[in-house]
A protein has these predicted regions:
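Low-complexity, intrinsically disordered terminal/linker segments enriched in charged
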Residues: 105-109, 113, 119-124, 132, ...
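Short, low-complexity N-terminal intrinsically disordered segments enriched in polar/charged residues
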Residues: 17-51
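N-terminal export leaders
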Residues: 3-8
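Surface-exposed, charged secondary-structure patches
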Residues: 60, 64-121
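Bacterial N-terminal signal peptides
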Residues: 9-14
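Structured segments of extracytoplasmic/periplasmic soluble domains
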Residues: 37, 41-45, 58-62, 66, ...
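Non-catalytic interaction/Regulatory regions outside core domains
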Residues: 24, 29, 39-40, 56, ...
Length: 154
């Protein structure tokens, strides 16, 4: 028959074990693998784009809040949001080829350069990244049409 001490020790361990299992996994992605996760599907003809409206998956908190606020306000007014194309390819339509990704990281910040041809036109996108508690996230995107930070200052 188990002793009282053994039963109490086992019961005491249960909450700690349950707590440990409930914690999100530690982010192990590098800034380059984060960007590859975003961009690798784009050359696939059937790919419809990343769900950038799921802002917490991609953007740092300040930019995520600005995008969400704009989407809510646009919906309330029955209008198109400021971000009316795919920010990762700077377009509403795409046919991506010759995708290349490079990253320069410095501690908790990184800059990614993504180049590709979209419908035969060479395009370069620069993404500023920061390491957050959720992993690497985008603080700004600089594209031929402008930057997200400028878009949301208007």
């Amino acid at each position: 028959m188990p002793s009282r001490r053994l039963i109490l020790a086992a019961l005491g361990a249960l909450p700690a074990q349950a707590w440990a299992q409930a914690q999100p996994p530690k982010e192990t992605l590098t800034p380059e693998s984060f960007l590859r996760g975003i961009y690798t599907p784009y050359p696939n003809q059937d790919f419809k784009g990343q769900p950038f409206w799921q802002v917490d998956r991609f953007f740092a908190p300040d930019l995520a809040r600005a995008i969400e606020a704009d989407m809510r306000e646009a919906k309330r007014r029955g209008e198109v949001p400021k971000l009316d194309g795919d920010p990762f390819v700077d377009a509403q339509d795409w046919d991506i080829a010759k995708l290349a990704i490079s990253v320069k990281a410095d501690g908790s910040k990184a800059v990614g350069l993504v180049s590709f041809e979209n419908q035969g036109k060479p395009t370069e996108i620069t993404l500023d990244l920061v390491r957050t508690g959720m992993g690497w996230r985008i603080t700004d995107i600089k594209a031929p049409s402008g930057t997200l930070s400028e878009l949301y200052k208007k």
